[in-house]
Structure formats: C-alpha cells, structure tokens
Amino acid sequence: METELHLAAGYCAATGVYRSGHPPQFAAAAALSFPEYILPHMLLPGRRARPAFVDASTGAALSFAGLRALSLRVARALAAAGLRRGRVALLLSPNSLHFPALSLAVLSLGAVLSAANPLLTPDELARQADDAKPFLALVTGELAPKLRSIAPDVKLVLVEQLLADVAAEVDDDETLDLPAANIGRDDAALLFYSSGTTGRSKGVVSTHGNAIAMAASLERAWGGGGGGGEKPQQYDDHDEAYGCVLPMFHMFGFSSFVMGTAALGATAVVVPGRFSVEKTMAAVEEYGVTRLLVVPPMVVKMVAAAAGDGEPSRRRLRLRQVVSSGAPLQREHMARFRSCFPAVNLGQCYGLTETTGIVTMCDLQHNDNGIDKVEMPPSSTDMTFVAVAATTTEVKERSTGGGGGGGGVSIGRLMPDVEAKIVDPDSGELLPPRRTGELWVRGPSTMRGYLNNEEATALALVAAAGSVSVSGGGERWLRTGDLCYVDSRGLVYVVDRVKELIKCNAYQVAPAELEDVLATHPDIHDAAVAPYPDKEAGEIPMAYVVKKQGSGHLQEDEVISFVQNKVAPYKKIRKVVFVDSIPRSPSGKILRRQLKNLLQGSILHRSRM
C-alpha cells in the first residue's frame, strides 16, 4: 500500500524527490533568448490576426502579429536611446494593452526588465532604483514626476510619446526582425523584487531560460486542461480568453500574460484600473472569458457581489475556471463560491518570484481543489495508515490548524519539469507523502539568484551533492519557506509559513520593514509587527507597541497615521495594541510566536476593565 501511495504521489523513496506527472519537456540545449522563443509563436497559423490583448474598458485590441511588430518597433526606438544588452530598464506603469509589448521590447535587446509597482512610495521606489541601477525608465506621464523626484539621473522615456512615435512608422510589419543582440538563455532577463524578512526587498534575477521554461510549462498545463489531464473534448486553444485583472508588474501576472497566454495563443482581456467586480464580470461576459486568474480578496468580493444581487443568474458566462494565488484561499470562501458559481471550477496555484511564476496548479479535469476530498497528514509520524476525510465536516474536525493552508485546500500538482522535496526544518530529513515539512523545489524556471546579495542567495538556493535534475533545471534546490505536505495523489497542501511575511491582499509585507519605521517614532520605545486575520485581505499588519516613559498620550490612530505616510497603502498598519514589552530571544530576535499571547492578554485585560 505504501509503495502504491508513493507511486501515485510521484515520490521516489530512494531520493526523497517528488516529480511532476507531466513528461519532461524542457530542451536544456536550446540556446534561445525568450524573445527568440516567444515571438515566432505569434506568427503560427491561425494566430496572426487573433487578438493577443484586448482592453476591456475601450474595446481596443492588439493582434498577435501586431504585438510582435509593436515589440520590435519599440525595441528599435529603445536601442536608439542607448538601451542594450546587460543594461537595466525600469518599467513603471499600471496594466495596459501595451505593457507586454514594452516588456518584450526590452528583452529583445538583451536588456534586463525591472518592473515596479506604481503604488510604491517615493522612498520605496528610490530603494529599488538604487539597487537595480536602471539605465533608463519607461514611465507613464502620470507617474513620471514621482520617478523624476527620486532618480533625477535616470533617463525617462514617456510611454505615451514612445507609442505615438512608433505608431507613425510606416515600414512593413513582415520585414521587422529581432535585433542582433547576441542573447543567450543564461543571460539575465528579469529583475523583479520579492519581499524579505530582513525588511528590504530583494532583486530576483531570472534568466531568459527561466522565462522560456515558464512559458512552455504554462502552455502545456493550460493547453492540456490544467494539470496533466487530457484536454476536454470541447477545449479549443483558439477559443480561449483569459481575464487579466492581476498586475503585470508582479510575477504572477507577468508570467501568466506576458509568458503564458502568449505561448498558448489565447486572448488576454485586460481590465485596467482598481479591481471591481462589476467591471470584471462585465468583461467576462462581453468578451467570453473562459479562465480568470485572481487573488483571494477578489474571490471574496465576487462571492459577496453574487450573493447580494444574483449576479450569476443574470449573466451568460463562458467562464470555466477561476485560479487563485498569492495567498491561501479559505475553504469557506471556496464553498460559497461554488454555491454562487456552480458551473465554474475554482482552484489554486502556487508560485514565487524566485520560481519565475507558477510551480503547482490545480487540474481542471480532476477537480484538485481539495474541497470534496482531502487527505490530512497523520497526527504522528506513523505512516501505516491513510487518513482520508471525505466530507467538509470531517475536514473541519481534523484540520491541522495551520494558518496558511486554507483549511486543507490543495494548491494543486507540480507543474511540468518541477521537482520537489519535503524537508524536516529541524533534522533535514526528507519526508514521504503526508508528512509536513518545508517545501523545496527545483526546475528550469528557478531563479539565478538575488542581485548583489550572495548571502541571501546561498540561504535560498541549496546544492544537493550528487543530485541531478531530470528536467534540466540544475542541481540547486530553492527553499520556499513554506510548510507543506504532499498527499497520496500528488496534491500539494500549504500548512503554514516558515517565513514571517504577512500576506495582505496577496501583497507581501515584511514585518521588519514596518518595525524599522515604527522605531523612528519619538514616543515608541519598542515595537513588533505580526499578521492579524482579516476576512477580506487575508491578513493585515498589526503593531505591538511599547511606549516610551512619559508618552502615555500616544494613541492607536497616531501610530497608524505615522506609518501610513511612509509606506505603500497595502503595507500600512491597520491595528495597534500597546504592551509592556516585546518578547525577544537573548540575541534580540523578536519571538513572533509569543506575540499572539500578548494579543490575547491585551484582549483579556480590556474585557475585565
């Protein structure tokens, strides 16, 4: 029985490695750049005139042939501005019809693309610019003053003017070709920033080979029905439309739409601006969106809107699947979604900036979301039995209580060419199915490392002696920092996080960064920040504050306001509790697990007053 369990999970007891159920596909010897790989996809039979991207707010569309031509024209203009191989281009822009073309143009020259969140404060943006050292910045007119104020020496290229200039060119699209940039698959392509527990974002360097691997992986997973199953009979790549409400300046959105849908040949419907259920569902209906990629707060809002006004019954939807990532999706939200949208499959995927996108995904064919059937890890290390909870009631009763697992909801199966280990954080033991440990992954999409940070790279990427990847992904394993287990079917579950990051509205918030800000307040003696559960946001940052002597007047709203003016909106402190001291180890490290006890003590104290 145990052997059968291991085989079904893709687990090899001899090596301790879990392997994807997909056949290996990555061509390690292919000496291509990402543009050399992706741009020919746009001229495949039947794709030239098909919309690659549609702006749902205006109806404007860009065909695959048009996307290719625009990318190459913009590349020519940027080359004239001095951008070339190895130089960094910062892209500061919200989602738009032209975001992918701007990105592909930069990559076509062998330059490195570093996208930035427009919501960053000037100080936060300055830190990224100082670290990335961009040669030039592609920026919208609205955001240009912010960037000019913090990086006066960086050459600014206004997106609106650039697009107007290349639109005036009259040469034949068919004669356009890639610039001779001499780019290799091991050259740096992307420099996206990932939050860290040190409080400073780290620049994640992904190569052209990483990007190719992710595009090929998504093409296979989505083109095959979602995760290893055969294509549904009615499935047609040419008829697929993906709803784009995710920011493309984050890796989930970038990999999904600049890599995935472009490789698949599917149309991406961009819904610009702040997320709105009304705008999104209108676009889903009007443009026949079949798959929608979201983060959990969007699911919560969709359910609330549907329950409030009968949204699904009034709309004729082709929507088949909603895929959520960025933070755990709670079981209760999945159940409510299913009752509101019974014809739509809701599942999760999992990925990191360090993996250049998605590494696990729920299978559309096999209903991998785990809401109907979930295997919990045994309460002990005894592996002589299989614990299967077949109903929601049983699952709730047997929940492990982990804060990150969404109540036993699967994050899917390993993507093509991805391998994994489950490692005991204390002993380093490699664990079999249904044992909980830290998830390590490797594959051809795993990052090269962190920019100018050898120490962080060495901690994150672990070389395993004598271990060679079967997928051409190298020998280094990425430590994800997440506690997970794999069940007997090969489904992966997140139980908790080893890392201390707060996931607020699917954004990563580093407690140490907020603690540094709080430490500058003249009336605060000591402070710590930890997550506080929130129904809509998942988690919100909450501060534990020790007042300085003589500062009894300090109030919660003053602390919140002080931090709010110094960080991006999603990072701001939402709650404050005043305590006598912050629990720390002898070395001064905050004992974060004990902060919950401080909160309970504070609540109990107030209830007795």
Curated annotation (Swiss-Prot):
Enzyme Commission number(s) of this protein: 6.2.1.12
Region (SBD1): 276-348
KW Transcription (keyword) present: no
This protein's UniProt keywords: ATP-binding, Ligase, Magnesium, Nucleotide-binding
GO MF terms, alphabetically ordered: 4-coumarate-CoA ligase activity; ATP binding; CoA-ligase activity; trans-cinnamate-CoA ligase activity
GO cellular component: peroxisome
Signal peptide annotation: none
GO BP annotations, alphabetical order: phenylpropanoid metabolic process
Enzyme class: ligase
Cofactor: Mg(2+)
Chain positions recorded as ATP binding sites: S194, S195, G196, T197, T198, K202, Q348, T353, D482, R497, K589
Chain intervals for the UniProt region annotation (SBD2): 349-450
The UniProt record lists the keyword Ligase: yes
UniProt: (E)-4-coumaroyl-AMP binding residues: F252, S256, G326, Q348, T353, M361, K499, K503
Residues noted as binding CoA in the record, renumbered to the chain: R274, A506
Enzymatic reactions: (E)-4-coumarate + ATP + CoA = (E)-4-coumaroyl-CoA + AMP + diphosphate; (E)-4-coumarate + ATP + H(+) = (E)-4-coumaroyl-AMP + diphosphate; (E)-4-coumaroyl-AMP + CoA = (E)-4-coumaroyl-CoA + AMP + H(+)
InterPro entries xref list: AMP-bd_C (IPR025110), AMP-bd_C_sf (IPR045851), AMP-binding_CS (IPR020845), AMP-dep_synth/lig_dom (IPR000873), ANL_N_sf (IPR042099)
Superkingdom: Eukaryota
Domains: entry comment: Both substrate-binding domains (SBD1 and SBD2) are involved in the substrate recognition, and are sufficient to confer the substrate specificity.
General function of this protein: Carboxylate--CoA ligase that may use 4-coumarate as substrate. Follows a two-step reaction mechanism, wherein the carboxylate substrate first undergoes adenylation by ATP, followed by a thioesterification in the presence of CoA to yield the final CoA thioester.
Family per record: Belongs to the ATP-dependent AMP-binding enzyme family.
Protein name: Putative 4-coumarate--CoA ligase-like 8
Lineage: Eukaryota, Viridiplantae, Streptophyta, Embryophyta, Tracheophyta
